[in-house]
Structures are given as C-alpha cells and as structure tokens.
Amino acid sequence: MKNKVVVVTGVPGVGGTTVTQKAMDILSEEGLNYKMVNFGSAMFEVANEEGLASDRDQMRKLDPETQKRIQKMAGRKIAEMAKEYPVAVDTHSTVKTPKGYLPGLPAWVLTELNPDMVIVVETDGDEILMRRLSDESRKRDLETTASIEEHQFMNRAAAMSYGVLTGATVKIVKNKNGLVDNAVEELISVLR
C-alpha cells in the first residue's frame, strides 16, 4: 500500500526546509514518522551509485538525457520508499536559470513520484530578501523583491500544473518573519 507522498517547495531563503523539518520532528513525537527526502540528494545517490558523479556539482555537467534518466530513477526510488512510510520530498517547484525557469518536477518525475499533495512555502519578497542578505552561510544570487515575487508566482503556477497532472492538492503555507511556529502548525494540519 502506498503511503502519502508530499512535495514541499519554496524559493531559496523562504524557510521551506526549516518548516518541514520542524513539522517532521513534531509529527514523529506523535508517532507519525514521515521520511524527509531532498530530491537533489536522491538524484545524487543514483548518479553516485552509477559512477556518474562524486559530488552534487558534477551532476549539472551531465548531458540532459542522463540527467532526465537520473531524475526519473530518483522519483521511482522515492515512490518505493512510500510503500514503507509516508514521505515528504524537499525540492524546488521551479529553478531560476539564466535561460528562464526550469520545472523542478518535470512530467517524467511526476509520473514516478505521483504526489498526493504539493505544498508551496511562501512569504513576502522583502522578507526573503532580508533573510538572504543576513544569511552569511550561503552564497546566493542577489535579486530584487520583484524578482523574488515573480519566482514565487512561477512556483504557484508550476505547483498547480503538478496538481493538474497528478490530482495532487496544492496548499500555500505562509512562513512570516517571527511566526515560523504558525507555518509549522499549518503544515502539520495537512500532513496528519
């Protein structure tokens, strides 16, 4: 029997991973043990097992067909996990590139993953900009508030298309400054 597969997305700096991890910890205390999987890490595991990459940066240099195959295999691997326990997939709905927005979950991944729910973590663009500027542990491209807002809009559009293709519900969770516990509670309410 398949357990729940939930995809959690958000732009860099919105706090999606933090909100998800805190929700997983609380749910675990309640006896609901989700496995949290980073999609990029799952892809790297596949690439590494096949001797195609020894670090995550090398994956970007693989030819597109190989990348697609690795994406598909990672999706299949996560779907297999869902036979054992519920899974929360931490990934990006879209990836902003110099040539435009790249879908984080193209059709061949969605077919394998078949999520039950897509969650988009958001907040105001100016809050994200300030978080990025104050986070010295990460090196991120400098963006304007308008650019961040556009990226969040594209994430919503992509999430809805993922829902159309799979029948997954789409939930927007707001992670406002100083109110992370509210975002965690909102996420928990749909994961139970």
Swiss-Prot record:
Chemical reaction(s) catalysed: AMP + ATP = 2 ADP
GO cellular component, one term: cytoplasm
Record's keyword terms, sorted: ATP-binding, Cytoplasm, Kinase, Nucleotide-binding, Transferase
Listed EC numbers: 2.7.4.3
Predominant place of localization: cytoplasm
Binding site for ATP: G10, V11, P12, G13, V14, G15, G16, T17, T18
Cellular location(s): Cytoplasm
Pfam families named in the record: AAA_17
Family named by the database record: Belongs to the archaeal adenylate kinase family.
Subunit structure: Monomer.
NCBIfam families (alphabetical): PRK04040.1
Protein name as annotated: Adenylate kinase
Organism annotation: Methanococcus maripaludis (strain C7 / ATCC BAA-1331)
Lineage of the organism: Archaea, Methanobacteriati, Methanobacteriota, Methanomada group, Methanococci
Designated gene of the protein: adkA
